Structure formats: structure tokens, C-alpha cells
Amino acid sequence: MLKIIIPTIMLMPLTWLSKKNMIWINTTTYSLLISLISLSLLNQPNNNSLNFSLMFFSDPLSAPLLVLTTWLLPLMLMASQHHLSKEPLIRKKLYITMLAMLQTFLIMTFTATELISFYILFEATLVPTLIIITRWGNQTERLNAGLYFLFYTLVGSLPLLVALISIQNLTGSLNFLLIQYWNQALPDSWSNIFLWLACMMAFMVKMPLYGLRLWLPKAHVEAPIAGSMVLAAILLKLGGYGMLRITMMLNPQTNFMAYPFLMLSLWGMIMTSSICLRQTDLKSLIAYSSVSHMALVIVAVLIQTPWSYMGATALMIAHGLTSSMLFCLANSNYERTHSRTMILARGLQTLLPLMAAWWLLASLTNLALPPSINLIGELFVVMSSFSWSNITIILMGANITITALYSLYMLITTQRGKYTHHINSIKPSFTRENALMALHMTPLLLLSLNPKIILGFTY
């Protein structure tokens, strides 16, 4: 694992030692090399030799998320170049340092063996993200958004620490690898119900669960492009990853405690999809679509069958790439029209024809068109929830329909129709942006050829 963690840490001195005109080239190529090294983790031979030390390990669940994390750093650097071009050099370097720091924390979070170190790193990712949102956001509301983000996440995860200490007293270990062999079931008692709630709440706020999702649209809308990308693609997946890891030790509590949360997620996924249909703000629409996709992941994790686990993992990876791509597209529109309102930036297909092709591809993967991995994930979740209860097919069907509706609504509003008068002279799309979209799209298309590497540990 150190072959990925140490190069990422060394990205920080590289940033500060780079010359003014080489800063983007150095950091982007270097981080791309790191992501190519991390690809070897996906090839895990099917024996029990986990690539682990006492501190860090990777298994079929954490490896895809880890590769996604390393893959997104060069993409974030590529996306940030334009809006940082006016900033002084020291701020550019600070920005890249923050991204590298966040990357390091995320890699260590996804590979930690101890639950306490997982918790500490889970909280540590908060600091760079907060600095990125509150320092480089676009509007003054960014401070408000940062405050929401900080308090929701902190208040959600404080009970988790207490719960972890209590599990430590109960089992004598918090090691992921050892705790799977702890075969004593938790007895039914009020304290254990609260233990379950404390463990799950931290991750449900992070996911976010419908009802605890107020921080997400705020944070997304106010964050700069790299903040939005890392938030949508990776920080939401921390919640799913934590839930997948921690449900193993909470049996049999999950079997009856899951019902209210399952209902809330099934309801919330339809509600947030419907909210998307009424959005005027482009970034806000993409943020709400993230909430509705993550609700599917919560449903999948709580059903607790091998199929639903596979669906949850596939959906997390697929959504990470898709939503990140959508945020990049929204940002490239914003850099030209200086407005996130969809009505003011319509009809861009005539002005940016190549961007329209990327918009079409991104919208189609977002509505889970076959043969994308979004479809594979959704299909697994729908099938496992149908076998859990037949009525859920109505809710799932409604959700998939509304998802298709708002994706097409987004595509038609931004691309089709007559363009407004105030955007008659805008820059054409840069090679950098097209390369960025291609680097988002290629993994999505390639993974649909071989989806088994992202189906997690139950495949």
C-alpha cells in the first residue's frame, strides 16, 4: 500500500518545488502515474492473500474505490486550471497541496485495517475539503455551506466514536480482518439498538440519507470544481464503504433495525429525483441526482444479500465517474456563461457542438443506459430489493423513470433550443476539457466490458 501512499505524500513537496510554468504539468503527470500504479490492485488473485500489512490492506471492496480516488486527482487538477489562472502562484500551490492532502487521507481511509484509524482518517478528510470549499468557492454563501458541511458530518460521526469504543470493550479488537471471525451475535437490548444507530448514523449523514441531506446541495453548489468532483465522486462513497464494512459486525441487529431506514431511502430516492425536475440551478440538479443515486446504495447495503452488495459497489464506482463528469461539464458551461441558471445557458449545442456530445454521453450514463455499469449496479439493486419485497418494484420503477426524465430535462435545457442573446461570443471548447471528459468516459466504457473487477467482495 505504501507504493501509493508515499508517492501521494511526495506530491506536496513536488508542488512547492515546481517552477511557475511547470506546476500543472508536473502535478498532473505525476498523479496520473500514481493512478496507473494503483491499477495493479484491481488484479487480486482469488486466494486469501490480501495485500495487507498491519496498518493498511486492500480487498476487492476497497481496491476499486482506491483506484477511483487516485484516478480523480489528475482529473481534478486538469479541471481546476482555468479558474485558478488568475490566482497568485502561492495560492495555486496551496490549492494543489490541499488536494494532495485530501487524496492521501482518502487512500489511507479506504485501506485502514483498524476501525479507530478508519474513524480518525474519515474525520481528517473533512479539513482539506472544508478549506477548499470555504477558500476557493464562488459565492459568499460558501462559508454557510462549509458550516453546514462541517456540523452535519461532525455531529453525525461523534456517536460513532463512542460506539467504536464500546465495540472495542465488547470484542477486544477493532481490526477489520479479525472482527469478521467474531461469531457472537449482539444480544437484543436497547443499548445495542443505540449502538447500531450510532454506527450507522455517521455513514448515513455522509451518504446522505434523505432527511439528513441538507448539507450536500449547499456544499456542491458553493464548492469550486475540484471540490464538487471529489465530494460527489469519493466523499459520498466513504459513507457507503463504511456501511458495507460495519454491517458485518452488527448482526443480527441490522435485520430488524433496517426497516425504517429502508423505507426512508426508498421514499427519499423518489422525492430527491422529483426535486431534480424542479431545479433551476444546474449544479444543484446534479447534487440532488447524487442523493437519489446514493439512496439506492443505502437500500442495497441494508438488504444485505450478496447481490445487493455487488450492486452497491458497482453503483458507487459508476456514480463516482458519472457525477464527476457532469460537474466538469457544468463547470465548463459556468466558465463561459458565468451563470449556473439553466435558462440563461440554454441552446449551447449550436455554439459548442463537441461539448454537446459529451453532455449526451454523460446524461445517458446518468440515466443508466445499457450497457453502462450504472445499469449493472441498478439492475442488481432492483433485483435484490424485488426479492426482498415485491412492492419495491413500483418505487424502483418510478425512480428509474424520473431519473430518465430529469437527465433528459437537463440535457434538453442546456443543449437544445435557441441560445440566449448574451452568449453570442464564447470561447470554443479546449483540448484540455475534451481530454478531461474522455478520461471520465473511458473507464465507464471499459468497465462495462469487464464489470467483475468492481463488484466487490461478494462476487
Swiss-Prot record:
UniProt keywords, alphabetically: Electron transport, Membrane, Mitochondrion, Mitochondrion inner membrane, NAD, Respiratory chain, Translocase, Transmembrane, Transmembrane helix, Transport, Ubiquinone
| Record family assignment | Belongs to the complex I subunit 4 family.
Record organism: Equus asinus (Donkey)
Query: Transmembrane ranges?
Result: 22-42, 60-80, 95-112, 113-133, 147-167, 192-212, 224-244, 256-276, 284-303, 308-330, 351-371, 391-411
Record-linked NCBIfam families: NDH_I_M (TIGR01972)
What InterPro entries does the entry give?
Answer: NADH4_N (IPR000260), NADH_Q_OxRdtase_chainM/4 (IPR010227), NADH_UbQ_OxRdtase (IPR003918), ND/Mrp_TM (IPR001750)
Report the record's Gene Ontology biological process terms: electron transport coupled proton transport; mitochondrial electron transport, NADH to ubiquinone; mitochondrial respiratory chain complex I assembly
Quaternary context: Core subunit of respiratory chain NADH dehydrogenase (Complex I) which is composed of 45 different subunits.
Per the record, GO CC terms? Answer: mitochondrial inner membrane
> What is the main EC category here?
translocase
Topology relative to the membrane: Multi-pass membrane protein
Q: Which reaction does it catalyse?
A: a ubiquinone + NADH + 5 H(+)(in) = a ubiquinol + NAD(+) + 4 H(+)(out)
Q: What is its biological role?
A: Core subunit of the mitochondrial membrane respiratory chain NADH dehydrogenase (Complex I) which catalyzes electron transfer from NADH through the respiratory chain, using ubiquinone as an electron acceptor. Essential for the catalytic activity and assembly of complex I.
Enzyme Commission numbers on file: 7.1.1.2
- A molecular function GO annotation: NADH dehydrogenase (ubiquinone) activity
Record protein name field: NADH-ubiquinone oxidoreductase chain 4
Q: Name one Pfam family in it.
A: Proton_antipo_M
Domain of life the protein comes from: Eukaryota
Tell where it localizes.
Answer: Mitochondrion inner membrane
